Amino acid sequence: MKRIFTVLLTLLLSLSFCFSQNPQAEAFLREDISRVACNYHGYEFKDYKYSRVPKGYEMVYLSHYGRHGSRYMTYTKGHEYVIKKLTQLQKAGLLNADGEELLRQTKEMHVMNEKNLHNLSPKGYQEHARIAERMFAREKKFFRKDLRIRGIASTADRCQSSMNSFCGALVRQNPRLTMDLDSKEEYMSYISNTSGFEETVHDKAGLIIDSLNNTILNPREAIRPLVTDLDEAYKLFNRPVRFEKYLHVVASIAEDLPVHYRPMKLIPFEEARKLWYIKNLDLYLNHCNSVEFGDIRIPYARSLAEDFITKADESLSGGCYDVDLRFGHDYPLMAFFSYIGLDRFNERYDRNHTDNWISSRDMHMATNLQIEFFRGKKGDVIVRFIHNDRETKIPALGPGPFYDWETVKAYWRDRY
């Protein structure tokens, strides 16, 4: 009976779903096919202009959260499944040259991932070092002082390594900086708070995602570029959707690894766009301010918002730290951005319109938020938000980019 209910619910979900097509998202993906990787996409370094700080204000503090940089896989089953199916096709003499190359390269990446499971990749180290250098360059006057910096990281090795790379780059710019770095389980209650998330959101959102996997994907089109005889090849797939999904994983993580091969180019654009859409939807429903689950998911970020407030007020009141750095993960960061009402995370979308939010633009590897604090001659404090090197805003509080800190605090504490 339970299985019948699940099947019926999945059918109803698929019938009520509309595969919307946001022209902005489509253009963004066409410009660079690697962006189909969603949150596996690497950091894009771009140059931005910044507003002049109001006269009479001086930077006195900076608070930050950065997602770990590009990494190796955290599991092996995706590569293993793709290798298994491609090997079957090879034995049947059905792989074309692109399919053969995909098999060879996937085997090499699989070995690489097994040796470095969960760890930061060389690209990830480079991302955080470069982000730190750009932050230093933007605020040279502040960072050339004898500052004391506190850094905390998730207990995951890739986050600790990101912190070390980031802070090492800062010290190379100014050897007089004092660093107090730490990583403890106790920090996880706010730096990566997802306790109870599986029961409250994940399983319910999963039903929606499963319904799309089986209704809008066309795995024949994903397999076509790899084989010599599509009809014969397709007979060897008992779960073709699974192959397509894992092919997307293999193609997505490739750009994070120390390899030049880019399998994403093998997936036809229309199919790649659908894969992006589903993964983008998955991320939004599970961790952003969705109509369906936002009221349940976003309050998990309150503890992180309080950490930002508490540490900022400590510093502004004469505390010993001039900079607070945090290194964690994308899931809590998405919820936090939604909680604080950050631009591009402040709008609420239902499951039919989540492609108005673009994960590979706003939550790629090494995504970070830097909040700069400036004190005026009268003692008042204003703040500016820098998201992935881009000056941004809190739309509910006005156009910005500078906001009164007391107003920001009151707004955050009144949320949820």
Residue ranges and their predicted role:
Residues M1-P23:
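Bacterial Sec-dependent N-terminal signal peptides
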Residues Q21-R148, S154-D324, G328-Y416:
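Signature for phosphate-centric chemistry
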